[in-house]
């Protein structure tokens, strides 16, 4: 998975992409979970989730271009790769492993490993943090890609101003709503355990 992730990023030919990959490695991105208890809550889950978002976004792009061929340049494969693969970089170095008591299937408490969130190191919003970390790595990134990373969570739990900004970002480029939809599809459908379907 790590190799495929890095190969896709490098295929964009972006200046400083190797610095981004170095920073991801240093922050533990490739070993990190995607969430504390939900989708991808295991080592490497974040890499798997990011690739699922990329695959979902590329599939949606293909379907959208059949309906709207004029969107081809606005939904370039390189922009989708950058936004989809880097939308959750803020989750690297965000979770720590802890031991908790939890009831098993027969009601007996046992020690289990769980992830806990530790965001006190850089407490800033989820989408904003990912966008800042990508910029901090020196990546040559477009405004549309930044908007897609910033708004990948969609219009949930936003202030009135933030709802307005989300709508504005969606009018500027189709990339933010595409990445939001792909992220939702990956976490809520593709990564759902088969037993829960």
Regions found by a protein language model. Name each.
Residues 17-24, 32-36, 96-98, 161-163:
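Short coil/turn segments at secondary-structure boundaries
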Residues 3, 18, 51-55, 128:
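Generic alpha-helical structural signal
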Residues 63-71:
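Inter-helical turn/loop segments and adjacent helix faces that build the functional surface
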Residues 25, 51-58, 62:
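Amphipathic, well-packed alpha-helical segments that form the structural scaffold of globular domains
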Residues 1-32:
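Non-catalytic interface/linker regions that flank or bridge core catalytic/transmembrane domains
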Residues 12, 61-64:
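A general structural signal marking secondary-structure boundaries and capping sites
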Residues 42, 48, 60, 72-195:
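Divalent metal-dependent catalytic cores for phosphoryl transfer on phosphate-bearing substrates
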Residues 25-49, 114-116:
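Active-site flanking loop/helix segments enriched in acidic
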């Amino acid at each position: 998975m790590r190799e495929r992730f890095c190969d896709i990023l490098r295929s964009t030919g972006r200046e400083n992409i190797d610095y981004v990959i170095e920073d991801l490695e240093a922050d533990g991105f490739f070993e990190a979970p995607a969430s504390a208890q939900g989708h991808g809550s295991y080592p490497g889950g974040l890499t798997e989730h990011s690739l699922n978002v990329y695959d979902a976004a590329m599939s949606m792009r293909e379907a959208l271009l059949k309906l709207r061929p004029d969107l081809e340049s606005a939904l370039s494969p390189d922009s989708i790769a950058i936004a989809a693969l880097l939308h959750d970089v803020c989750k690297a170095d965000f979770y720590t492993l802890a031991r908790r008591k939890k009831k098993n299937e027969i009601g007996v408490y046992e020690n289990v490993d769980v992830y806990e969130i530790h965001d006190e190191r850089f407490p800033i919003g989820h989408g904003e943090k990912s966008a800042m970390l990508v910029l901090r790595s020196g990546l040559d990134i477009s405004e549309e890609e930044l908007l897609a990373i910033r708004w990948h969570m969609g219009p949930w739990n936003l202030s009135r101003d933030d709802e307005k900004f989300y709508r504005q970002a969606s009018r500027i480029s189709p990339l933010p709503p595409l990445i939001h939809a792909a992220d939702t599809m990956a976490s809520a459908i593709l990564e759902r355990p088969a037993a829960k379907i």
